[in-house]
Every structure is written in C-alpha cells, then in structure tokens.
Design a protein with these regions (language model features):
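Conserved catalytic-site region of short-chain dehydrogenase/reductase
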Residues: 86-88
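Active-site catalytic microenvironments for nucleophilic, acid-base chemistry
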Residues: 19, 90-91
Length: 167
C-alpha cells in the first residue's frame, strides 16, 4: 500500500514497482486509514520539503497515529522513500525547524558540500556502499548504482541503523 497524502512522488513509485515487481504484488494507493491498517506492507513516499511533507501528513486526521500503530506498535514493514524516510527522524531543518515522526533518533540537515567538493543538489547516479545486511538490500549487490536527487540528509544518532551510504 502506498500512502497518498498529496506530497509524494507516487507516479514514480508506482512505475518503479511495476518495473521490478509486475504481477508479483498488488499496488494500492490510498489515504484510507482502514486500508493502511489492514495492509501487510506500507510505502511512505515524499517529495518536496521536510516541513511540507510533515504538514501534509498531519493534515489527514489520524494518519500519523495510524502510521505509528502500523510501524512502531505492530512492527509491520514501512518503507520510506526520499522525504518519506527523512520524516522518520526526530527533527528536520529544511526551511524551519520541524518535528518529525521520531521513529529513528536523528536529524535531517543540509548536506555538507565540504566547501564545494560536492555539488548540491546531489543529482545523479552513485554507487551505494552496503555496510549492514538488511532485507531492503537482500538481492542488491554492493556498489550497485542508485539514482539520487536531494540536498538534505538524515543523520541518525545511532550509526548502527545505517544500512548503506553513498559519496
């Protein structure tokens, strides 16, 4: 189930899943709390600023509580994509300081471009460095190329929650 809260890159997510899992999964896009609760897996996309995505989540009455119950209380798999993942943090500093979902202790901050060493926004294909076994990377080889479009990064307090990095 893909959560539709009017701030996600939903068409890109649907196209990606259709490309890699066509006929293997049933994709449903919804903001219906009952459908989200009854799902076995949920995807939380996100596009735009941290603040706008958090505000959009909060604008749907009961959605944050439903996602908390789903992921934290019931420990069901929830995949955050882009800002969807960043919102798992305690806090984000894009635009203004904004409280996140608080599922993973840490903060979302602007990427340190190390005095121009890295161009921002970070756009393009980069290799990922898998540093920890994770279900999300089960069938993905280390140094695989992934596509990135972002200027902010999630810095968790506990580095043991990091599964992969990129330069």
């Amino acid at each position: 189930t893909i959560v539709d809260y009017n701030s996600g890159n939903i068409s890109s997510v649907i196209n990606s899943f259709n490309e890699v899992a066509k006929d293997k999964i049933n994709i449903e896009v919804t903001s219906d709390l009952k459908k989200i609760k009854s799902s076995d897996k949920v995807i939380l996309p996100g596009q735009g600023s941290f603040k706008n995505c958090v505000d959009a989540l909060n604008s749907i009455n009961g959605l944050v509580d439903t996602l908390n119950e789903f992921a934290i209380n019931n420990k069901k798999p929830l995949l955050g994509i882009c800002v969807g993942l960043q919102m798992f943090a305690d806090i984000g500093y894009e635009e203004i300081e904004t409280k996140g979902l608080g599922w993973i202790s840490g903060a979302v901050t602007k990427i340190d471009n190390q005095n121009g060493k890295y161009k921002l926004p970070h756009i393009g294909w980069n290799q990922i460095n898998i540093i920890k076994n994770s279900r999300i990377f089960k069938d993905i080889e280390n140094n695989s190329h992934m596509y990135f479009v972002h200027s902010y990064e999630f810095i968790p307090e506990d580095k043991n929650v990091i599964s992969a990095t990129t330069d």
